Amino acid sequence: MDPTCEESPAEDSNNEEEDLDSTKAAPRIRDTPEDIVLEAPASGLAFHPTRDLLAAGDVDGDVFVFAYSCQEGETKELWSSGHHLKSCRAVVFSEDGQKLVTVSKDKAIHILDVEQGQLERRISKAHSAPINSVLLVDENALVTGDDTGGIRLWDQRKEGPLMDMRQHEEYIADMALDPAKKLLLTASGDGCLGVFNIKRRRFELLSEPQSGDLTSVALMKYGKKVACGSSEGTIYLFNWNGFGATSDRFALRAESIDCIVPVTENLLCTGSTDGIIRAVNILPNRVVGTVGQHAGEPVEALALSHCGHFLASSGHDQRLKFWDMTQLRTVVVDDYRRRKKKGGPLRALSSKAWSTDDFFAGLREDEEDAKAPEEVVRESDDDDDDSD
């Protein structure tokens, strides 16, 4: 459990026990849990909805569940599963936290018991192509997307899929759901944002294709905006109910944006191939700073803890890292026209982000990139959205 959530120990009236306790070294409490070192890079990452547990699926097909703590030496592996035959690409906990759903390049869906790590159900050949993403709809329903653009809706109580559609031409990189759990949004390698009505089990539309792969998708601004990361390092914004074309685009100083995770309604974090985890404000569009990095190794996945205090990241360095979100969650960007000084470093937003004498302090955002947030194509209703 996080130190802020732990109850203070009751006072012990026994003087002898107090003397014994005083001889023990007090456990060191860190700002974040210690790094977890794996034997292979993790491509799937998920926090438990209520407990201090982190699940990871790696490229060897192994799935792990860890208990994490800020008390030094207390972060540990609870169990692992090697049932997948190929790379585990995504993991997600059920709403009640009792099940863990995993999908793999081996085309299978696995449902495991969180307490014991036992495989409760295997759906072999769930797709005709390797599965790349999974999204939980409710306690019974889930959606999966594969490498050829196929989307399938499943009810865990039934055998076959409830919905099977293939509107995209390339892999399904990421998916998101509106709060009403009616519309499914899909980011695809074909550069299109897809919209599916899973309540009525029908396809709605595809957006105009962008110049790069869409690698990630998230709802922002209380559902008024949809943000998509791309392989070209650009964040594309869509208005809700205006999915046909982008309303804004925002280029980062990054080769690509491989994953994004919302932190607040205005702020999100991005993971890129340069190993940098950037904090980005949406409308006004600006890189706020850096949360951390994986020493130049690509960032594969990001996840936010149930309490919102920690961001977890996995990289090609085979490490799972934790980052403190406390400072970032207090950031407010309200000066739209202010520009960063030329050659200035990215602002450090956590104690573990690089300092001025660090190797990564050489990373600079030049003036051209500083202008990028302000040189976006804007729809007429964007200013109204930003003022809400």
Swiss-Prot record:
PROSITE patterns, A to Z: WD_REPEATS_1, WD_REPEATS_2, WD_REPEATS_REGION
Source organism superkingdom: Eukaryota
Gene Ontology terms: biological process: rRNA processing
Annotated stretches, region: Disordered: 1-33, 364-388
Comp. bias intervals (Acidic residues): 1-20
GO terms for cellular component: cytoplasm; nucleolus; nucleoplasm
UniProt keyword Phosphoprotein, yes or no: yes
Gene3D superfamilies for the chain: YVTN repeat-like/Quinoprotein amine dehydrogenase (2.130.10.10)
Family affiliation: Belongs to the WD repeat WDR55 family.
Name of the protein in its database record: WD repeat-containing protein 55
